[in-house]
């Protein structure tokens, strides 16, 4: 009988530990470089998968107006939840807008090249103007990670292409953080 109680206690203790570990993961985002971590006091509120394009325009270089390059204009993507349901869109600003009409704009705070040299960088953004009562209305920070594609064309552009626009397919995961309740 002592063994059964001890075994039961061990099982109960193990179960409690597992529940504790699982609970500690709730509200946490992905493993990212230190400079891309959400600030203390914020918890993960929503994760969204983005599929769309990064839009570039052939324009005079900001550092040398006699040279031309592909300059980033805006993103254009649909946002999906983990079940594949469309939950919103991502567009210039940068802005994320939910189907519930809440939205948030972001401002880049930090960046990291990420593990894929052929993909756009990973970012941490500060929320500038969250609005609405929905999923994005309380957002304070946004992470862009797990990027695929989206980089400006490697071949560059010249004056003869000035004003031309190219749309480069990309995918990314966005994590939205709100204040800890």
Task: Describe the predicted segments one by one.
Residues 1-11:
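Bacterial N-terminal signal peptides that target proteins for export
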